[in-house]
Amino acid sequence: MDGVANTPEKMERYIKTIYNKSNEMDRLINELTFYSKMDTKKIPYTFNKISVTEFFDDCAEDLQTELGAKNVEFYYSNYVEPEVTVIADAEQIKRVVNNIVSNSLKYTDSDKPKKINLRVKDVGDFIQVEIEDNGKGIAAKDLPNIFDRFYRTDASRNSSKGGSGIGLSIVKKIMEDHGGKVWATSKEHTGTVMYFVLRKYQEVPVNE
């Protein structure tokens, strides 16, 4: 990089760019590999009983570090009692969260501070997860299609945004395989909220 990164500041910036591009490539390869397993119905799920609070606390800690490095404001609220559990594949639910956050970051406005808000709520027999951004929002005509494979909204057609175009379709597939669902609400120029729900685990009483 002689003559290009000729100061420590430039060198640091180039290294950071290379690191970020490498991570993006790893994520793209990972998504395409997972996508191929979706079509052959060979997704290797490992379902376990997991603590909702412990799981999302860990997610929030990771996101705080990752988003902080990108100068994104991150907020986390958990309204679920500590004893609540779900039957889920922790790795794949983490993929759901990461894919939604990654999608949100691609389409945030560059002229205002980026914000991501993660909320976990108790809604009867389910836990509801909400991931809110303050991005460009999604037009009403596009909203029903955003979880379709390779669908891109008008706001996302710039190739510089990167990505595979399958991140949200993967989210939908994982949630369906967990017996849950995912949807979104949005307001243009204000932001988008992505929701997904998982059924709580409940012990079935055994008659003696």
Predicted regions and their residues:
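Short alpha-helical segment of the dimerization/phosphotransfer core of two-component systems
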Residues: 20-25
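Conserved micro-motifs of the catalytic ATP-binding
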Residues: 40-45, 83-88
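A conserved beta-strand-to-alpha-helix junction within the catalytic ATP-binding
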Residues: 46-64, 120
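Short helix-loop "hinge" at the ATP-lid/N-box region of the Bergerat-fold HATPase_c
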Residues: 104-105
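Short beta-strand/loop element within the Bergerat-fold HATPase_c
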Residues: 115-125
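Short conserved segment of the HATPase_c
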Residues: 138-150
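Conserved glycine-rich
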Residues: 179-180
